[in-house]
Amino acid sequence: MKFKTFGNRNDPAVLFFHAMGVTGESSEPVANYLQDRYFCILPTSTVYCKGQKYVSKADEIRQVEAYLKSQGVERLELVVASSIGADLAMAFLTSTKLSIGHVFFDGGQFAQIGKGTRRMMTPFLYLAIKSLYWSKGGTLKKILWCDDDSIKPYFIA
């Protein structure tokens, strides 16, 4: 796992969990805005870290906890999580001993989807991801309803 921070370590802490397909850097615009008042912590999952191997959700949480402890964080004023990052954040929230002020989930995937529906959706998701790759981001607007060039680097390597 890789961690990037913004702000003063002595200020109230804000922890971000990124969405699938992006890194912790996707939260930098918000962290830049907050850094004068908050200590912003942007972890990047091991899945996106060169030379690291994803082990488990529990291991990701262990790494976040260890980092927070190493930075002297005893309380989180805010936890922000997007999309699949909300799943990791929920696991973090249910296991951490840290005090949490507020939580904000953006597009968390908490629906219980049956096996049959998942099997039907998988080929479509696969094609959507492949089309992003093949078109070098050209289909981004069709998939995410946006085509802002400033966000393409977070989706297209």
Predicted regions and their residues:
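Conserved HGGG/HGGXW glycine-rich cap/lid loop of the alpha/beta-hydrolase fold
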Residues: 4-50
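Structural motif
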Residues: 12-13, 78, 102
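Active-site signature of alpha/beta-hydrolase-fold catalytic machinery across serine-
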Residues: 29, 91-95
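A generic structural motif
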Residues: 36-40, 74, 99
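Active-site loop/oxyanion-hole signature of alpha/beta-hydrolase fold enzymes
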Residues: 41-78
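Gly/Ala-rich beta-loop-alpha elbow adjacent to hydrolase catalytic centers
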Residues: 80-85, 89
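Flexible "cap/lid" loop of the alpha/beta hydrolase fold
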Residues: 94-131
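Conserved alpha/beta-hydrolase catalytic His-Asp/Glu region
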Residues: 114-117, 131-157
